Curated annotation (Swiss-Prot):
The lineage of its organism: Archaea, Methanobacteriati, Methanobacteriota, Thermococci, Thermococcales. It is an enzyme of class 6 (ligase). GO terms for molecular function: ATP binding; DNA binding; DNA ligase (ATP) activity; metal ion binding. This is DNA ligase. DNA ligase that seals nicks in double-stranded DNA during DNA replication, DNA recombination and DNA repair. Shows high activity with either ATP or NAD(+). Pfam families: DNA_ligase_A_C (PF04679), DNA_ligase_A_M (PF01068), DNA_ligase_A_N (PF04675).
Length: 559
């Protein structure tokens, strides 16, 4: 299958904002994809090469890409860089450079999707001495044979800036439409495996029956079950039917641990493979998780003086560290608090009631300094739960989780079977969709960021406020560098930004407001932290903001 066909799909997707049209375009394309490409193409449509949980990365920056294009076309690097300043779009500028190509390869052949993908794999797997030169050579060979439109989208895929507006929801619906299968079965299979390539292949070759048989696989992360908020311990008990399992809500990073013999893989909440950054936890899992094969979930907490928990950002620092890891083990010790088990030695436990899963977890784990079971209290008495809550806060934890005793594990679902109880209104995780250039000494920096939540009815991110406080100059420099490649449009000082970056925002209250299409606005929003552990799909939704608004009004009424 020619790559030009995929490039044509990208073009059509870029030209429409309608979700229904995008879904139809993707569905029509998938119908014609040969079986051997079914596991590759869904990721390319999303503007990716590999699933999020795959360790491989292309490791190519803008400068290396420009060099590769210059070698392929004979157009000087400086000319390409000046063109980028004029167009504001690296992909467009690379297409222009390919148009001016000064040498034509005598042996040039049309690019195929397989050749482009195989080249991306070679680029990702080039490591060690001379790897940058090899990456450049592989890409230059692609650009030599690429047409301008193909070059534009190859460049965007390499840099992860596709801008077609296709996210997981559109791809899910397109798979269902293309192969006449139920969208809910596609969703379920994806939530269990986090692998659109595998799900697409099953949908086409095995239909609804095959999708309904999809099971958890060790080595492929399961989408995490999520919780809603409760206003109080009493409200949580009432919602749970009078009895609940209360667990400490740790201020850490949620992880999913996959064990297959001596092979241990640990995924972050965002499904990124963080195994290499936390070797001491890997070793502890090998020795303390008894089953031969298992999938367990827990909260990774950074431990400070006297065993007190440190803010979750310390855990993220561990995740980011690629070198001198031994030093970081000493500086930021970690503790894994396990709270669930999803799979044990060939048996999926997602449909098993929660208390039975807890029993299986206790049987599976040998506790130590590194690995512990989440502290739990099962009770019908509000006063016992209140005392447990008070102790959790005194120890420096965030609050409590309340869980229905009979609840099954629902991957990717945020329902009322799990509830969070915290003493203050919860911060929001929002996506940056716009920004303004600063003034004076900050004129070269982006600031005053427009933040948005996802509106499931509209199928798009809608703004809920502007965040301009809480940033240091270093923060603004980092955000400017991060967001510049994601700028879609500029109008005066304002820039529209592709929704890719998630930040944690605190605020005084949520207000009803006609100012934004969402109907909500944050009062006095303030930046707290970059949420590298969350993808845009995991950010808070308008539905969630509406739920928090209702909780807020109930708090006010009780005063």
């Amino acid at each position: 299958m020619k790559y030009s066909e995929l490039a044509g799909l990208y073009r059509r997707l870029e030209k429409t904002t309608l979700k229904t049209l995008k879904t139809r375009f993707v569905a029509d394309f998938l119908k014609n994809v040969p079986d051997e490409l079914l596991e590759i193409v869904p990721y390319l449509i999303l503007g990716k090469v590999f699933p999020d949980w795959d360790e491989r990365e292309l490791g190519v920056g803008e400068k290396l890409l420009i060099k590769a294009v210059s070698i392929a076309t004979g157009v000087p690097e400086g000319e390409i860089e000046n063109s980028i300043k004029d167009t504001g779009d690296l992909g467009e500028s690379i297409a222009l450079a390919v148009k001016k190509k000064k040498q034509k390869s005598f042996f040039s052949q049309p690019l195929t999707i397989k050749r482009v993908y195989d080249t991306f794999v070679k680029v990702a797997e080039s490591q060690g001495e001379g790897s940058q030169d090899r990456k450049m050579k592989y890409l230059a060979n692609l650009f030599m044979d690429a047409q301008p439109e193909e070059a534009k989208y190859i460049a965007r895929t390499v840099l992860g800036t596709m801008r077609t507006g296709v996210a997981e929801g559109i791809l899910r619906d397109a798979i269902a439409e293309a192969f006449k299968v139920k969208a809910e079965l596609v969703e379920r299979a994806y939530m269990l495996t986090s692998d659109f390539g595998y799900v697409t292949k099953v949908a086409k070759l095995e239909g609804n029956e095959g999708l309904s048989k999809v099971r958890i696989q060790v080595g492929k992360p399961v989408r995490p079950m999520l919780a809603q908020n409760a206003a109080s311990v009493k409200d949580a008990l009432l919602e749970m039917g009078g009895e609940a399992a209360f667990e400490i809500k740790y201020d850490g990073a949620r992880v999913q641990v996959h064990k297959d013999g001596d092979r241990v893989v640990i995924y972050s909440r965002r499904l990124e493979n963080v195994t290499r950054s936390i070797p001491e936890i890997v070793e502890a899992v090998r020795s303390q998780l008894r089953p031969e094969k298992a999938i367990v979930e827990g909260e990774l907490v950074a431990v400070g003086d006297g065993g007190k928990p440190r803010p979750f950002q310390y855990v993220l620092r561990r995740f980011r560290r690629k070198y001198n890891i031994e030093e970081m083990i000493e500086r930021i010790p970690l503790e894994l608090n396990l709270f669930d088990v999803l799979y044990v030695d060939g048996e999926s436990l997602v449909d098993t009631p929660f208390m039975e899963r807890r029993k299986r977890l206790e049987e599976a784990v040998e506790e130590s300094e590194r690995i512990k079971l989440a502290q739990q209290l099962v009770t019908k008495k509000a006063e016992e739960a209140e005392e447990f809550y008070r102790r959790a806060l005194e120890l420096g934890h965030e609050g409590l989780m309340a869980k229905r005793l009979d609840s099954v594990y629902e991957p990717g679902n945020r329902g009322k079977k799990w509830l969070k109880i915290k003493p203050t209104m919860e911060d929001l995780d929002l996506v940056i969709i716009g920004a303004e250039w600063g003034e004076g000494r900050r004129a070269h920096l982006l600031g005053s960021f427009l933040v948005a939540a996802y509106d499931q009815h509209r199928g798009e991110f809608v703004p809920v406020g502007k965040v301009g406080s809480g940033f240091t100059d270093e923060d603004l420099a980092e955000f400017t560098k991060m967001l510049k490649p994601l700028i879609v449009r500029e109008e005066g000082k304002y820039v529209e930004i592709e929704p890719r970056v998630v930040i944690q925002v605190t605020y005084q209250e949520i207000q009803k407001s006609p100012k934004y299409e969402s109907g909500f606005a944050l009062r006095f929003p303030r930046y707290v932290a970059l949420r590298e552990d969350k993808s845009p799909e995991e950010a808070d939704t308008i539905e969630r903001i509406s739920e928090l608004y209702g909780l807020q009004e109930r708090f006010k009424a009780k005063r």
